[in-house]
Protein backbone atom coordinates (compact mmCIF):
# COMPACT_ATOMS: atom_id res chain seq x y z
CA UNK A 1 0.00 0.00 0.00
CA UNK A 2 1.21 3.53 -0.77
CA UNK A 3 2.16 5.89 1.99
CA UNK A 4 0.25 9.05 1.14
CA UNK A 5 1.11 12.30 2.92
CA UNK A 6 -1.19 15.28 3.25
CA UNK A 7 -0.72 18.90 4.26
CA UNK A 8 -3.10 21.60 5.43
CA UNK A 9 -2.98 25.30 6.21
CA UNK A 10 -4.34 27.05 9.30
CA UNK A 11 -6.60 29.12 7.02
CA UNK A 12 -8.47 25.95 6.06
CA UNK A 13 -10.19 26.16 9.45
CA UNK A 14 -11.50 29.70 9.71
CA UNK A 15 -14.37 31.77 11.01
CA UNK A 16 -16.40 31.45 7.82
CA UNK A 17 -16.26 35.18 7.12
CA UNK A 18 -16.20 35.97 3.42
CA UNK A 19 -17.38 38.52 0.85
CA UNK A 20 -20.96 37.33 1.40
CA UNK A 21 -21.20 37.74 5.12
CA UNK A 22 -19.71 37.91 8.60
CA UNK A 23 -18.08 35.18 10.63
CA UNK A 24 -20.26 32.20 11.51
CA UNK A 25 -18.05 30.67 14.19
CA UNK A 26 -15.34 31.67 16.64
CA UNK A 27 -11.66 31.83 15.74
CA UNK A 28 -9.60 28.82 16.84
CA UNK A 29 -6.07 29.43 18.07
CA UNK A 30 -3.39 28.56 15.50
CA UNK A 31 -1.55 26.18 17.80
CA UNK A 32 -4.78 24.39 18.68
CA UNK A 33 -5.48 23.94 14.96
CA UNK A 34 -1.99 22.56 14.38
CA UNK A 35 -2.30 20.11 17.28
CA UNK A 36 -5.59 18.86 15.84
CA UNK A 37 -4.05 18.56 12.35
CA UNK A 38 -1.32 16.34 13.84
CA UNK A 39 -3.95 14.20 15.59
CA UNK A 40 -5.79 13.84 12.28
CA UNK A 41 -2.67 12.46 10.61
CA UNK A 42 -1.49 15.37 8.48
CA UNK A 43 2.23 15.30 7.68
CA UNK A 44 2.92 18.97 7.03
CA UNK A 45 1.54 22.44 7.51
CA UNK A 46 1.27 25.13 4.84
CA UNK A 47 1.86 28.66 6.11
CA UNK A 48 1.28 32.20 5.05
CA UNK A 49 3.96 34.40 6.56
CA UNK A 50 1.42 35.88 8.97
CA UNK A 51 0.12 32.43 9.94
CA UNK A 52 3.63 31.50 11.01
CA UNK A 53 4.27 34.86 12.67
CA UNK A 54 0.99 36.61 13.52
CA UNK A 55 1.18 40.41 13.41
CA UNK A 56 4.33 40.11 11.31
CA UNK A 57 4.42 43.85 10.55
CA UNK A 58 4.99 44.59 14.24
CA UNK A 59 8.33 42.76 14.46
CA UNK A 60 11.92 43.23 13.39
CA UNK A 61 13.60 40.76 11.08
CA UNK A 62 15.35 39.06 14.00
CA UNK A 63 12.16 38.89 16.08
CA UNK A 64 10.41 37.25 13.12
CA UNK A 65 13.17 34.65 12.87
CA UNK A 66 12.96 34.00 16.64
CA UNK A 67 9.21 33.43 16.42
CA UNK A 68 9.71 31.14 13.42
CA UNK A 69 12.30 29.11 15.37
CA UNK A 70 9.82 28.72 18.23
CA UNK A 71 7.19 27.53 15.75
CA UNK A 72 9.69 25.03 14.32
CA UNK A 73 10.19 23.55 17.80
CA UNK A 74 6.42 23.27 18.19
CA UNK A 75 6.05 21.54 14.81
CA UNK A 76 8.92 19.18 15.64
CA UNK A 77 7.26 18.26 18.95
CA UNK A 78 4.21 17.13 16.98
CA UNK A 79 6.15 15.35 14.25
CA UNK A 80 5.04 17.86 11.62
CA UNK A 81 6.97 19.55 8.84
CA UNK A 82 6.39 22.92 7.22
CA UNK A 83 5.56 22.39 3.55
CA UNK A 84 5.89 26.00 2.38
CA UNK A 85 5.58 29.63 3.38
CA UNK A 86 3.77 32.20 1.23
CA UNK A 87 3.66 35.96 1.70
CA UNK A 88 0.02 36.97 2.20
CA UNK A 89 0.20 40.16 0.19
CA UNK A 90 -3.45 40.68 -0.65
CA UNK A 91 -4.65 41.53 2.87
CA UNK A 92 -2.63 44.70 3.52
CA UNK A 93 -3.39 48.26 2.44
CA UNK A 94 0.11 48.48 0.91
CA UNK A 95 -0.71 45.72 -1.52
CA UNK A 96 -4.36 46.38 -2.39
CA UNK A 97 -3.22 47.29 -5.92
CA UNK A 98 -0.79 44.40 -6.15
CA UNK A 99 2.41 44.80 -4.21
CA UNK A 100 5.01 43.84 -6.79
CA UNK A 101 3.20 45.61 -9.64
CA UNK A 102 2.06 48.66 -7.70
CA UNK A 103 2.76 52.11 -9.09
CA UNK A 104 3.90 53.06 -5.57
CA UNK A 105 7.60 52.45 -4.90
CA UNK A 106 6.80 52.29 -1.17
CA UNK A 107 4.25 49.54 -1.74
CA UNK A 108 6.64 47.57 -3.96
CA UNK A 109 9.30 47.86 -1.24
CA UNK A 110 6.81 46.60 1.35
CA UNK A 111 5.93 43.62 -0.87
CA UNK A 112 9.63 42.75 -1.13
CA UNK A 113 10.01 43.07 2.65
CA UNK A 114 7.19 40.56 3.13
CA UNK A 115 8.60 38.25 0.45
CA UNK A 116 12.03 38.31 2.11
CA UNK A 117 10.45 37.61 5.52
CA UNK A 118 8.63 34.64 3.98
CA UNK A 119 11.97 33.30 2.77
CA UNK A 120 13.47 33.87 6.23
CA UNK A 121 10.55 32.07 7.88
CA UNK A 122 10.76 29.18 5.41
CA UNK A 123 14.46 28.84 6.16
CA UNK A 124 13.85 28.80 9.92
CA UNK A 125 11.04 26.24 9.56
CA UNK A 126 13.03 24.04 7.19
CA UNK A 127 10.33 24.45 4.55
CA UNK A 128 11.67 23.40 1.14
CA UNK A 129 9.84 26.11 -0.79
CA UNK A 130 7.87 29.30 -0.82
CA UNK A 131 4.69 29.85 -2.78
CA UNK A 132 3.95 33.13 -4.50
CA UNK A 133 0.21 33.74 -4.85
CA UNK A 134 -0.22 36.75 -7.09
CA UNK A 135 -3.78 37.44 -5.93
CA UNK A 136 -3.93 41.18 -6.60
CA UNK A 137 -1.14 41.52 -9.11
CA UNK A 138 -2.03 42.48 -12.64
CA UNK A 139 -3.28 45.27 -14.82
CA UNK A 140 -7.04 44.95 -14.50
CA UNK A 141 -7.56 48.60 -15.37
CA UNK A 142 -5.40 49.22 -18.44
CA UNK A 143 -5.24 52.94 -17.73
CA UNK A 144 -3.80 52.45 -14.23
CA UNK A 145 -0.37 51.18 -15.29
CA UNK A 146 1.60 50.00 -18.26
CA UNK A 147 1.32 46.21 -18.58
CA UNK A 148 4.91 46.03 -19.86
CA UNK A 149 6.24 48.13 -16.98
CA UNK A 150 4.18 46.22 -14.40
CA UNK A 151 5.32 42.84 -15.71
CA UNK A 152 8.93 44.03 -15.55
CA UNK A 153 8.38 45.00 -11.90
CA UNK A 154 7.11 41.49 -11.17
CA UNK A 155 10.03 39.85 -12.96
CA UNK A 156 12.48 42.05 -11.04
CA UNK A 157 10.80 41.10 -7.74
CA UNK A 158 10.97 37.38 -8.51
CA UNK A 159 14.62 37.68 -9.54
CA UNK A 160 15.41 39.46 -6.24
CA UNK A 161 13.76 36.61 -4.33
CA UNK A 162 15.72 34.03 -6.31
CA UNK A 163 18.98 35.92 -5.65
CA UNK A 164 18.41 35.93 -1.90
CA UNK A 165 20.68 33.46 -0.16
CA UNK A 166 18.58 30.74 1.36
CA UNK A 167 17.94 27.03 1.52
CA UNK A 168 14.57 27.50 -0.18
Model-based region annotation:
Residues 132-139:
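Short, conserved phosphate-binding/catalytic loop or strand-edge motifs used
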Residues 1-129, 148, 152-163:
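N-terminal pre-domain/capping segments
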Residues 167-168:
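Conserved small/polar residues in nucleotide/adenosyl-binding loops
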Amino acid sequence: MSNFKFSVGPWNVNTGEDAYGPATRKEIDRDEKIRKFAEMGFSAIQFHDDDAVPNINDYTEEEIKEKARALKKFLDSLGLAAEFVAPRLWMDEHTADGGFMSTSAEDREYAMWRAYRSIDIANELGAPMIVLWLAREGTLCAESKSPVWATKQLIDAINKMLDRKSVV
